[in-house]
Amino acid sequence: MKIKLAKSEVIHFIGIGGIGMSGLSLIMKRKGFKVQGSDISNNKNTNRLKKENIKVFVGHQKENINKATIIVVSSAIKKNNPELLHAKLKQLPIYKRGEMLANIVSLTKNIVVVGSHGKTTTTSLIASIFQNTKIDPTIINGGIINSINNTAKLGKSDWSILEADESDGSFIFIPPTYSIITNIDREHMDYYSSMKELNKYFVNFVDKVPSFGKSFICLDDKNNKNLIKNLKNKNFYTYGLDIKSNFCIKNIKQYRFFSEFDLRIILPNKKKRIIRK
């Protein structure tokens, strides 16, 4: 999906205080767009946004969107929200967070982390690794990353590192270059009609990874194993504690502030390697 955006647009985020919405709004602001939003109360996220000169309305009222030309709505917002209803009455373009996220990263090489659990931790680890390289990626995470002291950062390179939210199915709009699937659990059944439908979304997402990219799927999760069986796109590696994983973690030792482990790597047509860390 390609969303045409002009710098004159006023983009209003309904539910801007959410961790994912606040990060996306920050990136849009730093890209030069006019950004505002609303939430039911102030929190740490809205306070960070105010420091970036992003206007935040406390409470949801139809008057909040008087100047808005585009609406981005959180998956937590109910259908009877007065701002959402007024936006529909005004026939304003309305997008889910995932749709807008997909639009701003569509021209970048990206790493997209999806799954029911562990997304934020995984995204944070990848982002922190990139922070120690010469690559300066755009980062949008579901939690504070210590290395940037924020949930999001606009980078100068053509790389993006993203945490994608599966709660409303909008992650399917994101075109992944590299994807990481942590696990799939029985969640968000208010949106998905069944586990079968939830699994189908993940299958469709992984199948979109191009031949020059790659997916990395945790083999420790039983639903991920079912995911693999249904994939048309076999361009993936597996990881985890499972001995059949391409990247297998062994001999784990946990200490107070760090862990040690051996990493066994077995790739098709490659010699087995063991990295001790």
Regions found by a protein language model. Name each.
Residues M1-F57, K67-I71, A87-L92, S124, ...:
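ATP-dependent carboxylate-amine ligase
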Residues I3-V10, I14, L49-K50, S74-S75, ...:
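Adenine nucleotide phosphate-binding catalytic loops in nucleotide-utilizing enzymes
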Residues Q36, S106, D262-I265:
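Active-site-flanking structural segment that lines cofactor/substrate pockets
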Residues I40-S41, Q61, E99-M100, L241:
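Short, ordered loop/turn segments at secondary-structure junctions
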Residues K2-K4, I27-F33, K50, E63-N64, ...:
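Phosphate-binding loop of NTP-binding sites
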Residues N66-A68, K156-D158, Y255-S259:
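A short, glycine/Asx- and small/polar-enriched loop/turn
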